[in-house]
């Protein structure tokens, strides 16, 4: 008997680590701590020497992180991949993490790849994504009975904002299901460019969101592109939390991480801050995926019926463990979360 309590949707990608640090950033017009979809002029980055590979894709990372702290067979992730070795690597990585993959397959398009450039002694990361097959996910893929049964079984639905560029229809379908069944519906803001260039799609989903997770750059972009005059992270988070909701049974919670600085939670017109434990710089190996790991801990806690304090604390712990190892991974053998 399965017990899949968490369903995630976004883009299954393979992270492709590229060396060169700031020289590579300059060569391809990239910024540190940013995420972009690759333009034609940036496609050459995927021919740069590869330092290492790891399974990526923001929400996929979060679902693997959630499964790290949840009982076996708790988490399902959906998206579209190609029919190639990269897809095999993703499936293998998810299986190793205990994450169930419900992928549609497009044999004509390669699996999506995300170039990762680390800089500043691996403390900063820049992401440049070629979506590939991930861009071809369709609503009909989600509605296949063998996939939809996991949506119906789930207690919590998590969607990555990057899917706004792919299939907002699928995001809305999940949102409506969550609303009708009073399940928490969580979206990640994912990247600053989404609020700017996919504003209409984002604004169609936000009213359904019970929780919105993001970082400082993402919430600032949201404010700038939604006519919010303030550049204060707390004020913008409060404004987003008060956008009208479809499901009136619960108020919206906006959760904003700020790296090593305090995480902000805006809810019911109030802001609460949570200071994460600081990881000594000599223990930091790779900051890529820290925000994904935080989101994974947060959604794992919610799927088990835990409150916000616990969810933020678990998210912080997973984020801290993630940056101590290379890639968007977590330590093995598994560590146990030190319960408060």
From Swiss-Prot:
InterPro entries: Adenokinase, Carboh/pur_kinase_PfkB_CS, PfkB_dom, Ribokinase-like
An example molecular function term from Gene Ontology annotations: adenosine kinase activity
CC cofactor: Mg(2+)
Keywords: ATP-binding, Kinase, Magnesium, Nucleotide-binding, Purine salvage, Transferase
PROSITE patterns hit by this protein: PFKB_KINASES_2
This protein's GO CC annotations: cytosol; nucleus
Any one GO BP annotation for this protein: AMP salvage
EC numbers on record: 2.7.1.20
Keyword Transmembrane attached: no
Family: Belongs to the carbohydrate kinase PfkB family.
Protein's recorded name: Adenosine kinase
Organism classification: Eukaryota, Fungi, Dikarya, Ascomycota, Taphrinomycotina
């Amino acid at each position: 008997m399965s017990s899949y309590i968490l369903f995630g949707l976004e883009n299954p990608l393979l992270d492709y680590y590229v060396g060169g640090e700031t020289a590579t950033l300059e060569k391809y017009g990239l910024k540190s701590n940013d995420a972009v979809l690759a333009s034609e002029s940036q496609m050459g980055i995927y021919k740069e020497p590869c330092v290492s590979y790891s399974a990526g894709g923001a929400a996929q990372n979060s679902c693997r992180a959630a499964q790290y702290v949840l009982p076996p067979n708790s988490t399902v992730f959906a998206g579209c991949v190609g029919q190639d070795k990269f897809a095999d690597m993703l499936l293998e990585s998810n299986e190793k993490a205990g994450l169930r993959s419900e992928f549609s397959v497009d044999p004509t398009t390669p699996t999506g790849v995300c170039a990762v450039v680390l800089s500043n002694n691996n403390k900063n990361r820049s992401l440049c994504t070629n979506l590939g097959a991930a861009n071809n996910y369709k609503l009909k893929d989600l509605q296949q009975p063998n996939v939809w049964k996991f949506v119906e079984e789930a207690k919590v639905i998590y969607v990555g904002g990057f899917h706004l560029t792919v299939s907002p229809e699928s995001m809305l379908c999940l949102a409506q299901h969550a609303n009708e069944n009073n399940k928490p519906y969580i979206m990640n803001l994912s990247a600053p460019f989404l609020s700017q260039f996919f504003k209409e799609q984002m604004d169609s989903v936000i009213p359904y969101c019970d929780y919105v997770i993001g970082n400082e750059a993402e919430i600032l972009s949201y404010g700038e592109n939604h006519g919010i005059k303030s550049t204060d992270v707390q004020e913008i988070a409060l404004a987003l939390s008060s956008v009208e909701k479809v499901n009136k049974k619960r108020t919206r919670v906006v959760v904003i991480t700020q790296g090593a600085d305090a995480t902000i939670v805006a809810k019911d017109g109030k802001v609460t801050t949570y200071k994460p434990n600081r990881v000594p710089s000599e223990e930091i190996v790779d900051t890529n995926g820290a925000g994904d790991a935080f989101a994974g801990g947060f959604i794992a806690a919610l799927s088990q019926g835990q409150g916000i304090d616990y969810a933020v604390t678990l998210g912080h712990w997973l984020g801290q463990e993630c940056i101590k190892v290379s890639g968007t991974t977590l330590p093995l053998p598994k560590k146990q979360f030190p319960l408060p």
